[in-house]
Structures are given as structure tokens and as C-alpha cells.
A protein has these predicted regions:
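C-terminal catalytic lobe of FAD-dependent flavoproteins
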Residues: 6, 15, 29, 37-177
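A generic local secondary-structure boundary/capping motif
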Residues: 8-9, 242
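Short hydrophobic-aromatic micro-motifs
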Residues: 10-12, 18-22, 200
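Short, well-ordered strand-loop elements centered on a beta-strand within folded domains, enriched
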Residues: 17-22, 98-99, 212-217
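General beta-strand structural signal in soluble alpha/beta enzymes
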Residues: 20, 69-70, 99-100, 194, ...
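Catalytic strand-loop segment that frames the active site of acyl-thioester-processing enzymes
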Residues: 23-35
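Glycine/proline-enriched, intrinsically flexible loops and inter-domain linkers
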Residues: 129-248
């Protein structure tokens, strides 16, 4: 098994053949008009143009692929949730109906733990430990909007192989819920994150930094990120004086 996250690809032996798969950065939404009742492990129409950049990178990574030929080009759908986390637990509007779905292509490796947790949940009447990050009840009605799903689904698949930086924010389907203070916070230099669809100020860019040409945007890193010093200043201001937080 070979994974190359920077190229969104994985390679493995499969039934005596060599399989190349990918989690591309700009996925194509499918099923927006509904999924047929009889759809089960079916194949979608081939889309060589969409896969071509992935294939070119694969040939560059493993030159032998240039002469290997393609035995089967399989284009199939995969289920990804709007926040790349499971849908697990008792359905909020249907008593004793439990769900384990939306595993975002990590279902096999998650099956043992998720199955155990769900079984204990069903038996004990409550989650065996804090599972809110994957609890189906976190989903909101607006996340069933066609427009929202089309935009967000293009992003979520590619994030599987992207760097999972701390505090990483979704880039698509944003700005859906804004508090009455939103524009005031934005004018004050706020950098927004998303909480249940709400735009929430995570930190503020000081005026002098803005004058130097800096922007109120995350610069993701595994090290100390660009907002750390600004958050330190905010922390001291609240600790030593007073602060007002918009918790919408």
C-alpha cells in the first residue's frame, strides 16, 4: 500500500492487479436529484477528463504505469458528510432508530469502534462516552439545502488526504448564518470560523497589522500559526479588563 497525500492518490495490489485511486481536491457532486432505490455498488459513467490530472501524477510517481494499460476504469460514488464526521446515534425525530452512516471512506477502519459504541448506546440508552463530534443530532436543517450540499461536497472528499492542520476551517458554503454583530466584527478585523453554520469571530487582526498588508486569514501550519500573537493580546485584554463575546 502506497499513499501520496500531496498528490491525493493511493496505490495498492487488488485481486492480482494494480489499483490506483484518488481523493481529488475538487470533487464532483452526485445524487443531487435523488439516488435510485435499486442503486447498489453500481458504476457511474467514466470521466477521464476529471481523472486525468490524477493519472498524470500517478504516471510520474510510478513510470511503469505509462505502459501498463488500464484494465478497468471504475467511477463510483462515495458518501461524505458536510463536516467529514460520521452520522452516529439515535435519529432525533425517530425513537429507537439508530444510524451509523457517512463514514467518509474510513468505514472499514472505524467499524469496530463505531459498532461497539453504537451497541453500547442502544443497550444503555445513552452514549457510552462523549460522541457529540459524530452525533447525528448535530446536523442542522440548512445542511440539507441543495446549494449548500453542492458547494460543500466539492471540498469534503479532498480533505481526507489534505493536511489536517489545527483549527482548519471549511472554505465552501460559508456565510449562511450571521449574527447582528457580524459586520461590526468584520470591520474590527475579525477572522471568522464556522460553528453550526454560524460565522463566529475566532480572532482579530490588529489595525497596525492590517496597515502592514496582513489579512485576517488563517495561515495554517503545524507550528505556531499567524494568529497566535493576536490571540495572546486578546487574552490579556480580557483577563486584565473586560471583553464581549458573540456566541451565536
Amino acid at each position: 500500500m502506497l499513499r501520496v497525500p500531496d498528490e491525493c492518490t493511493y496505490y495498492k495490489e487488488d485481486a492480482g492487479k494494480f489499483l490506483v485511486g484518488a481523493f481529488e481536491l475538487n470533487a464532483k457532486p452526485w445524487g443531487m436529484d435523488g439516488i435510485p432505490d435499486n442503486f447498489c455498488f453500481d458504476q457511474l459513467p467514466e470521466d477521464i477528463d476529471h481523472f486525468e490530472p490524477i493519472l498524470e501524477a500517478a504516471v510520474n510517481r510510478l513510470p511503469i504505469l505509462a505502459t501498463a494499460g488500464i484494465h478497468t476504469f471504475f467511477n463510483g460514488p462515495e458518501s461524505f458528510t458536510p463536516d467529514d464526521r460520521y452520522l452516529l446515534g439515535e435519529a432525533p425525530e425517530l425513537k429507537n432508530f439508530f444510524v451509523a452512516a457517512g463514514f467518509n471512506s474510513v468505514g472499514i477502519q472505524s467499524a469496530g469502534g463505531a459498532g461497539m459504541a453504537l451497541a453500547q448506546w442502544m443497550d444503555g440508552g445513552e452514549a457510552p462516552f462523549d460522541l457529540w463530534d459524530v452525533d447525528i443530532r448535530r446536523m442542522q436543517p440548512f445542511q440539507n439545502s441543495r446549494t449548500y450540499l453542492v458547494e460543500r461536497s466539492k471540498e469534503t472528499l479532498g480533505l481526507l488526504y489534505a493536511d489536517h492542520f489545527p483549527y482548519r476551517q471549511f472554505a465552501t458554503a460559508r456565510g449562511l448564518r450571521r449574527s447582528a454583530l457580524h459586520e461590526h466584527l468584520k470591520a474590527a478585523g475579525a477572522c471568522f470560523g464556522e460553528v453550526a453554520g454560524w460565522e463566529r469571530a475566532n480572532w482579530f487582526l490588529p489595525a497596525d497589522a492590517a496597515e502592514r498588508g496582513e489579512k485576517a486569514e488563517y495561515q495554517y501550519s503545524w507550528k505556531r500559526q499567524n494568529w497566535f500573537e493576536y490571540a495572546r493580546i486578546e487574552h490579556l485584554a480580557v483577563r486584565n479588563d473586560v471583553g464581549l463575546f458573540d456566541m451565536s
